[in-house]
């Protein structure tokens, strides 16, 4: 994947990010290129070695086909999940870390439904908020709209599916 300054990409754990610059740094006498990513949510800048960008999960924003798949995932029936809180939390954490937008959508769907049915622990509420933030950021970019509209779209899809 070729990265250019000004491209918008998705970075796992943080969501949408803008490539602000491509820097060359010398580490242990070796010149390496780094992508300087400005995360859309919050005031965070991340530097990722260009060689490892795909390995750590930096990818393009989903297109219309990918968006349709995300909506299918959000509408899909509830998946079987571990009843043990710590196992469920760990499984969801792994899905978020994968950087796969469909796995993030699964986390949002499952935690949202669990919240509607039984409520969530404080840790799972934070995880749901983080997963929603990542998904809303990507939906906003894919739909070419703002976060508020993307959040409305997400809420409508979730409500219609339940």
Curated annotation (Swiss-Prot):
SUPFAM superfamilies linked to this entry: CarD-like
Highest taxon of source: Bacteria
Phenotype caused by lack of the gene: Essential for growth, it cannot be disrupted.
Cited Gene3D superfamilies: 2.40.10.170, CarD-like, C-terminal domain (1.20.58.1290)
Induction: Induced by DNA damage and starvation.
Any one GO BP annotation for this protein: rRNA transcription
Intrachain disulfide bonds: none
UniProt xrefs under InterPro entries: CarD-like/TRCF_RID, CarD-like/TRCF_RID_sf, CarD-like_C, CarD-like_regulator, CarD_C
PANTHER family from the UniProt entry: RNA POLYMERASE-BINDING TRANSCRIPTION FACTOR CARD (PTHR38447:SF1), TRANSCRIPTION FACTOR YDEB-RELATED (PTHR38447)
Family according to the record: Belongs to the CarD family.
Function noted in UniProt: Controls rRNA transcription by binding to the RNA polymerase (RNAP). Required for the stringent response to starvation, oxidative and genotoxic stresses as well as control of rRNA under normal growth conditions.
Subunit-structure text: Interacts directly with the N-terminus of the RNA polymerase subunit beta (RpoB).
Name assigned to this protein: RNA polymerase-binding transcription factor CarD
Gene source species: Mycolicibacterium smegmatis (strain ATCC 700084 / mc(2)155)
Gene that this sequence comes from: carD
